[in-house]
Amino acid sequence: MTNATGPQMAYYGAASMDFGYPEGVSIVDFVRPEIKPYVHQHWYNYPPVNPMWHYLLGVIYLFLGTVSIFGNGLVIYLFNKSAALRTPANILVVNLALSDLIMLTTNVPFFTYNCFSGGVWMFSPQYCEIYACLGAITGVCSIWLLCMISFDRYNIICNGFNGPKLTTGKAVVFALISWVIAIGCALPPFFGWGNYILEGILDSCSYDYLTQDFNTFSYNIFIFVFDYFLPAAIIVFSYVFIVKAIFAHEAAMRAQAKKMNVSTLRSNEADAQRAEIRIAKTALVNVSLWFICWTPYALISLKGVMGDTSGITPLVSTLPALLAKSCSCYNPFVYAISHPKYRLAITQHLPWFCVHETETKSNDDSQSNSTVAQDKA
């Protein structure tokens, strides 16, 4: 069976078996000879997965790609169409949308083709490296743009008008820094530090976190620090202090109202409480989604590079990568389309979307800080 070729479905249930593969068939048996140098020896220990996994993952990736094109494309379109959205903060958001859009449009078509055309990598070895590099650049860039967005929100909400203002120039610099960090983290394998190889069920390519040598170990520790640990610290720091600042502000207002012998300084206390709850929930959702998407892949990579490859099966390796790529679908909705100003732009420029957002203005100065906080969060 070592020379088996063609779709894996043809071998599923062979040799008088109702389910599974004949004994001795490896997941690597279906890989073309010129691709095998890009397959780590670890995967030779596993039989192919049920072919239905390939079809299921192909359908899921097609869905993710469609949602990403719609969501991120809409954000980019509205940014270019509406002058009101072309703010410094939204420069970061539109770069996030661009990065996410590139990730899905450069990865999804090839992954789904592999899923439906044989269940293994069907393209050249060189494009395996390009595929992995593009996924790394856009993934890391999105992570750091989320850090920049989180820090901007922290600066606005915690420092208010006393903090340094985010100008268009600064926003462009922050976006460029994110792209430079991403490129700097993704290019080393082309120069001998680390490797890009096939991973999991061999439908896609990514970092090599299985080879046990100092070269691979040092590169993976480098990307773990710059792609996960530092961004996680910045995002958690930002949102923890955002929530603390909001509740401290509300406590100060209640104390001031008590000194003035009034029940509240607000015209509508119920609305204020709802705004506080919304801000806290938004912060919790932002942090939780980030960790849900990126932590499994980071832990699997760290487990492999530390030498413990037990339990890293083809599916265990593949599913965290799916979670990581799914962030490109929710980002445009969490960071842009859910915002009232984006919904207003949809109402104005795409009325057939049936989004009916009305422009509101508040004249109550006592609510200014919370209004800014609610918009930014």
Swiss-Prot record:
SMART domains: 7TM_GPCR_Srsx. Residues 79-90, 152-170, 247-281, 339-377 are cytoplasmic. The chain crosses the membrane at residues 54-78, 91-115, 132-151, 171-194, 219-246, 282-305, 314-338. Disulfide bonds join 128-205. The modification N6-(retinylidene)lysine is found at residue 325. Its main location: membrane. Expressed in all of the seven retinular cells (R1-R7) forming the main rhabdom in each ommatidium. Residues 1-53, 116-131, 195-218, 306-313 are extracellular. Keywords: Chromophore, Disulfide bond, G-protein coupled receptor, Glycoprotein, Membrane, Phosphoprotein, Photoreceptor protein, Receptor, Retinal protein, Sensory transduction, Transducer, Transmembrane, Transmembrane helix, Vision. Glycans are attached at residue 3. Pfam families: 7tm_1. GO terms for molecular function: G protein-coupled receptor activity; photoreceptor activity. It is a multi-pass membrane protein. Phosphorylated on some or all of the serine and threonine residues present in the C-terminal region. GO terms for cellular component: membrane. It is found in: Membrane. Coiled coil: none annotated. The keyword Hydrolase does not apply. GO terms for biological process: phototransduction; visual perception. Belongs to the G-protein coupled receptor 1 family. Opsin subfamily. Visual pigments are the light-absorbing molecules that mediate vision. They consist of an apoprotein, opsin, covalently linked to cis-retinal. This opsin produces visual pigments with maximal absorption in the blue-green region of the spectrum. PANTHER family: OPSIN. This is Compound eye opsin BCRH2.
